[in-house]
From Swiss-Prot:
CDD domains (UniProt xref): crotonase-like
SUPFAM superfamilies assigned to the protein according to its UniProt record, in alphabetical order: ClpP/crotonase (SSF52096)
Note: Gene clusters encoding host-selective toxins (HSTs) are localized on conditionally dispensable chromosomes (CDCs), also called supernumerary chromosomes, where they are present in multiple copies. The CDCs are not essential for saprophytic growth but controls host-selective pathogenicity.
Keywords from the UniProt entry: Lyase, Virulence
Protein name as it appears in the record: Enoyl-CoA hydratase AKT6-1
Pathway assigned to this chain's UniProt record: Mycotoxin biosynthesis
Family, per entry: Belongs to the enoyl-CoA hydratase/isomerase family.
Lineage: Eukaryota, Fungi, Dikarya, Ascomycota, Pezizomycotina
One Gene Ontology term of the molecular function aspect: lyase activity
Enzyme class, broadest EC rank: lyase
Gene name of the record: AKT6-1
Region (Disordered) residue spans: 1-23
Keyword Ubl conjugation: no
Functional description taken from the UniProt entry: Enoyl-CoA hydratase; part of the gene clusters that mediate the biosynthesis of the host-selective toxins (HSTs) AK-toxins responsible for Japanese pear black spot disease by the Japanese pear pathotype. AK-toxins are esters of 9,10-epoxy 8-hydroxy 9-methyldecatrienoic acid (EDA). On cellular level, AK-toxins affect plasma membrane of susceptible cells and cause a sudden increase in loss of K(+) after a few minutes of toxin treatment.
The EC number(s) this enzyme carries: 4.2.1.-
Length: 298
């Protein structure tokens, strides 16, 4: 089996250099039992990883108003939990997410639906945890936004992304912000105007999809290997990386001041770096941060 790959920013356990070798067959993590269920989703947690599974396969995992609100609450809750380091979002069945549920009262709830989507994408975008979209199938409309608001995206080769709203006399008003940001103006505009399917291989070449797996089983391997790499990334340092990215992306003039604040904080007594550098000096180059003593004394 073959995969298309890119490199990640985390160290592999056997090398000093960053690596994202998804051709290797690392041990698949055994998932815990379902922690909770809601109307259209399931939540599983193991160690520092939370998995959110969209579970409306009969509706293409479409986002109902209630599901959008529930997902927002989940991301807001996990954002404040020290035990959570990563959040994986994926779908059950054929589709990743087919967008907003058009079977609901579209016109009566238009404003509420727009606000619910804005809140959802805002909660994911602002989440200090590393977010991963494991895209198991096609995504339409809001589902495309759901994938590309996440930090890292891996997809099965049979997936595609379609901003099909224009065919219905609509436009992807809420998700366009994130699609334009991640895809660039030219591709995003073409995709919105033509409603053409955008295939994962093209997005991988652009660097906005970070791995493409041959099939769904291979996607599981890709995802677990990525999570294994991310296990070596210190959680607070990861949150700072995301915060710096937001500052730069938004063109904030206070980026340098913010960077100085982080530079001082990250070397303070009791910080992750105090532990990490001490371990490095002892010859231990890779730390499983879920097991790090410094995190358990907080």
């Amino acid at each position: 089996m073959t995969f298309s790959t890119t490199k990640s920013v985390a160290m592999s356990p056997d090398d000093d250099a960053p690596s994202f070798d998804i051709n290797s067959s690392r041990r698949l993590m055994s998932h815990s039992e379902v922690e909770s269920r809601g109307n259209g989703y399931e939540v599983l947690q193991q160690a520092g990883t939370v998995r959110i599974l969209l579970s409306r396969p009969e509706r293409g995992n479409a986002l109902s108003l209630s599901l959008a609100k529930d997902l927002t609450q989940l991301f807001q809750t996990f954002s404040s939990q020290h035990s959570v380091h990563r959040i994986v979002l994926t779908g059950k069945g054929k589709y990743f997410c087919s967008g907003m549920d058009l079977g609901e009262e579209l016109y009566e709830d238009a404003t509420e639906r727009c606000l619910a989507l804005q809140d959802l994408f805002g909660a994911i975008d602002a989440c200090p945890k590393t977010t991963v979209a494991a895209i198991n199938g096609p995504a339409f409309g809001g589902g495309v936004g759901l994938a590309f608001v996440c930090d890292i995206r891996v997809a099965v080769s049979t997936s595609f992304f379609c901003l099909s709203e224009v065919k219905l006399g609509l436009c992807p008003a809420t998700v366009s912000r994130f699609i334009i940001r991640e895809w660039g103006v030219s591709l995003a505009r073409m995709a919105m105007l033509t409603a053409r399917k955008i295939h994962p291989q093209a997005l991988q070449e652009m660097g906005v999809l970070h791995a493409v797996a041959l099939d769904e089983e291979a996607l599981k391997v890709v995802t677990e290997n990525l999570l294994d790499d991310l296990g070596f990334a210190a959680p607070q340092a990861s949150a700072w990386c995301k915060a710096l990215t937001r500052k730069t992306r938004n063109g904030n003039s206070d980026h340098d001041q913010f960077a100085r604040q982080i530079s001082e904080t990250m070397v303070a007594p009791g910080s992750e770096s105090e532990y990490g550098v001490a371990q490095f000096r002892r010859g231990r180059k890779n730390i499983r941060w879920e097991q790090a003593e410094c995190l358990h004394t907080r």
